[in-house]
Amino acid sequence: KRQPYKQPIYYYVKQEPVTVTPEVEKQLEGRVLVDGEFSFKIKEVNENKSLPSYEETVTNKNGKATFSKLSFNKVGTYKYTISEIAGSDANVDYDAMTVTMTVTVTENSKGDLQASVKYTGEGGFKSSADDKIFNNYVVAPVKTKFDFSKALAGRELKAGEFSFVLKDSTGKVLQTKTNTKAGVVAFDDLTFDNTQVGTHKYTVEEVIPENKEAGMTYDTMKAEVTITVTKEGHVLKATNTLPTDTEFNNTFTPAATQAQFRFTKRLEGKTLEANAFTFELLENGNVIQTKQNAADGSIQFDPISYATVGTHTYTVREKAGTDTNID
């Protein structure tokens, strides 16, 4: 007997999609990493430019940047790029590395989808072929300072009596300092940050006062200072280049003055006559003037002029005569 035809029944088992969670690591050198301070973008590499590409941006948390799960329901190879979005902090060196995430989706013997993930790093601060750690560096500022000196001829130097300015290349006064009693002119630290790598020029000058001290000659030297800021890795270094002459020299010339010595000669038992006695004026043992008495007994030496500050010691003595009746 002929059996009636039976329609075959086909059963389809729907494959479950396989999921992958993209994740990279974040490290910061120089200070403590704060959650949410750095941003990362994942973007699908789509060979068909006309199709929209998947994108997502997240921030770091607990030292990682974790993106949303990606679902795959088809066997194939899928590529994504992960990069850090450079921030605006000028004192941070941001890692420009690009990480390519390759997802290979296959079907196992049971017909289930499975995925393998491979990360490769390129550019930036890449340390290995499979690097997926984004390393940022906080670049600490560098400080440097320098001194000049002050010398004064003609009298003793006083603390704080002369002023000096430090100017930048535009002529703007950055600092004003005075000398110590020992003649040191010390300027404060100059600080340079990550944006100031390069050459910086300055000028140091003595301030010439409007009301100049009488007898003072001021040094008009304009001393040029060059500071070169370089970067080795992520560390700043400052090198100072000072001129050969770093001493400001002033000269004090006091107004000329005079001194004149007058003495009196007395003679007992006899009338004093003019020019009867001779007197010598000595300095440092050397006779510098010789005078005789007047009839009234006065002895007057010539005026002595002084052009410099100092101490002078003199001796006046009577030159012995030949009259044996006079002691």
Language model features: what each stretch is:
Residues 1-327:
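Solvent-exposed loop/turn and edge beta-strand elements of beta-rich ligand-binding domains
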